[in-house]
Amino acid sequence: MKTAFARDPFTAPATGTYGTIYASRSLPRLSISKFLEDANPEIYELSRYEALGTNRPSSGKRAMQPAVSKPALLETVFTLDIWYRRTNNQNIGNLRDSVSRFLSDDRVREAVMVRLDLDIVVQLKEYWLIVKDKEAQTFADRLAFDSHLFVNRGENANYDLVTQTFIPSDTFLKDNFKTEALKKLLLSVQSHTGLDAGLQGDSSKATYNIGLGQYLEDEALLYRQGVALQQMAFAELELARGAEKEAFPSTFDLSNRPACNLILKRTCKWYQQTFKAEERKEFAKSLWVDDFAEANWNTGNLSFGFSTTLNVIERWRLTRFYVHMYSSVHIYSQKASG
């Protein structure tokens, strides 16, 4: 499975100093393979309390076999491969190989929809619990990395985090990732999510793919909650643009945009739970360094959580980026707090 990369430069900052800005790649987001998107809703209930390997009578067994699209199952093989690479769990590798062999069978070569035994779904639920903590940390590392790049990008490298991709030069990486915490962050991104370089990494962009967990157990509810708040925030951002007929308003004000404000607060809290204070100071000195406090959120040198050293457009761009990331953050922040 190939990951799409933008090839044509959208704009080029100072040559060799910062890097190159490309038109948007597929935006990092939470939505996973469409494995169960076209399966019957009953499958969620069927898999809720069923233990792995439970014996079932043959009568009605076909009704308990979800029908899924073949492309969705192909994407699931890719997801399982990522999980296996991150955990070296042989059971995950075995399931990946089993599903892959099934897809190569002559009987399903031309199929559009295929049926799976419920045990497959139950296994995926079990394996998601194994990889969940790793996925949470990997996603946090990528979010911190992208934030660090944007805040420290240099005055000649202006770009939008949502619609453009910044590919840092070797010089930029050498100058901006000197400390141990930043080196660790860079290594995580290079190893697990693939640093944008126009070449496919072993699991490039996969950190924004929560895996099948979004459909299983409480993750399904958390995902829907996150998307609902995310959609409200999208609407608020569009209204903000329409008021002044510009890409971003001339002032940064979220007082009438409660969904955006709530997303920033929750993302800030989760970010601070995930990274220690000394790490946050190294990542992005103007972003959520001091511990969250409701009373200080929009006073003094803070503007709705952002340092006032960031200009208005930077604050709007970061806000829009975190809104786009929120469906993931909602699941992982609930995990951290619960």
From Swiss-Prot:
Keyword terms: Capsid protein, Virion
Localization in the cell: Virion
Annotated Gene Ontology cellular component terms: viral capsid
Source domain of life: Viruses
Main location: virion
Its biological purpose: Plays an important role in virus transmission by the insect vector. May participate in the virus stability by binding clamp proteins and surrounding the pentameric turrets present in the virion.
Protein known as: Structural protein VP9
Originating organism: Rice ragged stunt virus (isolate Thailand) (RRSV)
Origin organism lineage: Viruses, Riboviria, Orthornavirae, Duplornaviricota, Resentoviricetes
